[in-house]
């Protein structure tokens, strides 16, 4: 294994090669603004490195590149459409561009974090193209095509540099995580069966949920890394669902042990409690549990434990297939065929997304009006920086710190860019080698700092490349540099002011929406078999978002896990069907989820709890077993007891 310093040096060399190669090819092909291709190579390679805090995986660079291509094409098409329709009304055209940027930011806040970059980019790409062509609108098609071509060139250079200098495959990290998955699940089961240390159980649950979420992200990166891994990706998709199922089963055993400490027979308690330290020991323990289950016959055992042993056996089989990447066998094919496609649900951050879109639209519109009113030369650059910062920063976990990173980068880029613009670049005009060496030194230093997640490092690299006039041919008017540099700084500052002024107070509202969605998912498990679907991955995504918004709220976290456990228990229960009562329960749950106003939601929750209780009483009169009705009673009790969390 390479030393971490060697890995950091390797990525810095990759970043340098990508930027220098994009510039050389840009000058060779006679592109008008090779700066765009260099900036693209820098952002595609350095962006994932800053997010990961180290050298990014090869698949992450390719994924980022595809998102940038999609966003650029969408933004270019929007710019062409606006220019064709509103060429005679430039003010209205610019304001509609600002509205488009706001809409794209709003939509990017509703999609998954991994895909938000494409929508955010398409918003300010349209603004860049329209602003650049205001003086010569007849060249907008040429400018849009050139921008798309330079973006593709920069991405190709970033991918080529990563491929030439030993790409970092995500497969090794996937094998490490998958290899230790059974051990982690068994340790969680031990803590749940013991049940004395609730904090240790919470830590184990939290760690496994984050590990499963990370594994799902690595699967997307592995799929783009090479065409050798489609079988591994199929297995990883099933492993993700199996991991979440085992976590839920362990949580169910924990709740069962707290209610009935004698639910598990003594031989199972003794075997589970024995310590395990390595994945090999965990595999041997699983085989012992299977033998004990076969000898015991499954009589008087909690269904959760039987399901856990069965799921762990499937997980171990798929984990071996991921490591070897061999052809999918008959038993694996049966497991993969049984794994239903996960259901997609809408984002719970609608209010948060609306605020983000409002921030971008308001900031860019005010910047555009000020620019058109004042005639300031740097106004267009300032407005574009406002759009860039507000579009990208609001989708990060900490928008304020992301905006500060942009601001610090633009401030550092001012003296660094001045040195290059006034001294270094004019002195290297007669030698292409010296030009590449001078820019390579800057990108190498920034590449080392980006991997340390140094505040302002990524902003410095992007801002410096943006204000340097890397055009063909190159000219060095000092007024242009000063306007561009000052416009960048003021744009980042105004974007930070807008983020601080337009407060986002939707955290509590989003938390209540997430809890209501988890409750709705538990109630939805009462539907017929054909309409249930695989809700488990979607429910855990809601839980992961809940953990991100409320990292220290253990009570809310436990309540969410309880609702997920009840959803699984109800989904696998064999309750008699009462179509009329189930329709009433489903209608009340829908009103609880989508109802406007606290009074309506309060009434819907009362109808829901009453309907669940009536349904349970009706089943008792029909002679249903008490064990089958237990999750139904628990769900009604949880919804009534925690109505304050659901309604606020």
Curated annotation (Swiss-Prot):
Role according to the record: Forms an efflux pump with AaeA. Could function as a metabolic relief valve, allowing to eliminate certain compounds when they accumulate to high levels in the cell.
TM region(s), chain numbering: 11-31, 41-61, 65-87, 91-110, 125-145, 150-170, 369-389, 406-426, 430-450, 455-474, 481-501
Gene Ontology MF term list: transmembrane transporter activity
Top-rank lineage group of the source organism: Bacteria
Main location: membrane
Subcellular location as annotated: Cell inner membrane
Alphabetized Pfam families for the sequence: FUSC
InterPro entries the record matches: PHBA_efflux_AaeB/fusaric-R, PHBA_efflux_pump_AaeB
Stated family: Belongs to the aromatic acid exporter ArAE (TC 2.A.85) family.
Signal peptide: none
Membrane topology designation: Multi-pass membrane protein
Gene Ontology CC terms, in alphabetical order: plasma membrane
Alphabetical GO biological process terms: carboxylic acid transport
Protein name: p-hydroxybenzoic acid efflux pump subunit AaeB
